[in-house]
UniProtKB/Swiss-Prot annotation:
Keywords: Mitochondrion, Transit peptide
Family: Belongs to the AIM23 family.
Top-level division of the source organism's lineage: Eukaryota
Record lineage: Eukaryota, Fungi, Dikarya, Ascomycota, Saccharomycotina
Protein name, UniProt field: Altered inheritance of mitochondria protein 23, mitochondrial
Gene that encodes it: AIM23
Pfam families for this protein: mIF3
Length: 356
């Protein structure tokens, strides 16, 4: 039997332990602690989500949506301001030309700009009373081949709401008004682009408007005001060679915003007679008309009268010794005809003189 000294055995064990002196095993490796690294990252992500949730709650989010990121939370879309003004209103017209439909749609669009609900006031053709309505119902059944729409007045309710007074007019009147609207719109666009000069615009208005003056006169005007203020205004214009058109109507109508449109149909023969006024009112209007004739008799030719004293009237005045302008077509034709006859007569006389 081999005998080994005890000292040698102890020295060998000490040498073995010295070679592993830097290894310290504090925990045995097993299946339970195999995912310890994964748990560390999982806890860190959980903590990050908790902090994010607290931040979401501090910003006033709902508690049930606090666990979701902001980009996944569905929020209702906010309605933009003035969305009703930008909403396209569509009314289907079954009659009329394309131009007539465009004119009607232009009026409808203007109505909704002034009142987003489409509320209007209309004149009842049977009772002749102003009654409330809505353009969606009022437009039904309108035959655009015969008639059209026109805004004759606008009533201001408050700072935001207005109620237009809508009237049914002849198709030609509606188309004429729409053409004027497009012309003004195009002129404005050209001026903004710099294509049309302001001086040119002023020149055109000078030719068309400056020579023709409009004066409003109420049937209820006092006699002193008519003989002094109005008489001075009318006579001054006639002396300068301006043509003057006088508009006579009731005080409430003559002071409306679109008072001129009430006189558009007086240039043609009216169907039917307006209701008869009380004798005192009729005599008052007759006195106003007679006073106007006396005022202008010295400075103007015989006035052209349109309308009826029971309703409204137009008095067209041309100053004396002034040739009619182009818009007086009949008078211009007569003048040219007379000039041609005079020239022809002179030629005949010259021919006779040469033959002799």
């Amino acid at each position: 039997m081999l005998k080994v000294p005890l000292s040698d055995v102890l020295s060998q064990k000490m040498l073995f332990l010295k070679s592993f002196r830097y290894f310290h095993c504090t925990k045995y490796f097993s299946r339970d602690n195999a995912s310890s690294t994964t748990d560390i990252f999982r806890n860190a992500m959980k903590r990050k989500r908790e902090l994010a949730n607290l931040k979401e709650q501090s910003h006033g989010n709902v508690a049930r949506n606090a666990a979701f990121p902001k980009e996944y939370i569905k929020r209702p879309k906010q309605v933009p301001r003035n969305a009703t003004n930008r909403k396209k209103i569509l009314i289907t017209w079954s009659t009329g030309t394309d131009r007539a439909k465009e004119a009607a749609n232009s009026v409808v669009s203007e109505i909704f700009k002034k009142n987003h609900k489409g509320n209007i006031k209309v004149v009842d053709p049977t009772t002749h009373r102003i009654e409330p309505s809505n353009i969606r119902y009022f437009a039904k059944g309108i035959d655009l081949d015969k008639v059209g729409l026109s805004i004759v007045n606008v009533e201001q309710i408050d700072n935001e709401n207005q109620i237009p007074l809508v009237k049914i007019v002849e198709s030609r009147v509606a188309l004429k008004k729409y053409s004027d609207f497009l012309a003004k719109k195009k002129e404005k666009e050209l001026m903004e682009l710099g294509v049309l000069n302001k001086s040119y615009k002023n020149l055109v208005t000078d030719k068309k408007e400056d020579n023709l003056k409009h004066i409003k006169i109420s049937w209820q005007i006092e006699s002193d005001d008519l003989k002094r203020q109005k008489a001075h205004e009318i006579v001054s214009l006639l002396k300068k060679g301006n043509k003057v058109t006088l508009y006579l109507d009731d005080k409430n109508n003559i002071n409306s915003n679109n008072w001129l449109e009430n006189f558009e149909e007086l240039d043609r023969s009216q169907k039917g007679e307006p209701p008869r006024l009380p004798e005192s009112v009729f005599q008052k209007r007759a006195a106003v008309l007679e006073t106007l004739k006396e005022i202008v008799s010295e400075y103007a030719n015989d006035p052209v009268l349109l309308g009826n004293m029971n309703s409204k009237m137009i008095m067209k005045l041309i100053p004396k010794d002034v040739k009619p302008q182009n818009n007086d077509k009949r008078a211009l034709k007569e003048l040219r005809k007379k000039e041609r006859q005079e020239k022809l007569q002179k030629r005949i006389q010259r021919k006779k003189m040469n033959e002799m």
